[in-house]
Amino acid sequence: MNVVPRKSLGQHFLVDENILGVIERLAELGPDDVVLEIGPGLGVLTRFLAARVAHVHAVELDRRLEAELAGIERTTLHWGDALRLDLASLAPSPSKLVANLPYNVATPIVAESLARTDLLQWCVMVQREVADRFFATPRTKAYGSVSVLVQLATRRTGFHPVSRDVFRPRPNVDSALVAFTRIGPGADPGVKRVVEAAFSHRRKTLANALALAGAASRERAVAALQEIGRGASVRAEELAPDEFVTLAEALA
């Protein structure tokens, strides 16, 4: 490996091919699939995907990896920030996101990808605590805005702990593969705005958090909570994902 991973980019390159079979199973790869991969690194997963699917769109920020990623069959390389990529411009259009996501952008990448309704399945390698957040239940420490957004759009279909030894450099945290599939369009912009505001001040009551974030006055928030059967003292982590939809409707 000639490229030194950069901590600033959250790079932990996948180097052990033994995990690839698990990815293939959890991602339910098929010959007609078009896959989006973000953070291909040294191309270990990219080559594996390209040999099994119709097309791979690989998005990489680090130009030092050009030599590692050049010439992979059935693969289009996109250089730049994945969070600024216009997924609608990709042709053919990907229906699956399969990736060893960079640690420092894994959560926003997944959250933003939910808005693309043509993406139907995800299989991502992330920090274990991030994977736990995606499908955390209300009233738990891990439950937050990304939990609500992910669960409004998807259901979990697979989970697999990943050894630290499959990466270089070896990370100081545990990782996991988590797979999920779309069940609906997910949160619209109004719901997303309420969810993010609700969790922006976790130590406050939900009504106060919404007021502090500028999403609604406290009085209006309390009235909306009462409309959905919740009291003024409820906190964001007590509401189930679908309750945020009804709350947003009450606030509209």
What are the roles of these predicted feature ranges?
Residues 1-197, 226, 237, 246-249:
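Catalytic cores of RNA-modifying enzymes
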Residues 172, 199-204, 215-252:
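Conserved Class I S-adenosyl-L-methionine
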Residues 196, 207-211:
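Amphipathic alpha-helical segments within well-ordered protein domains
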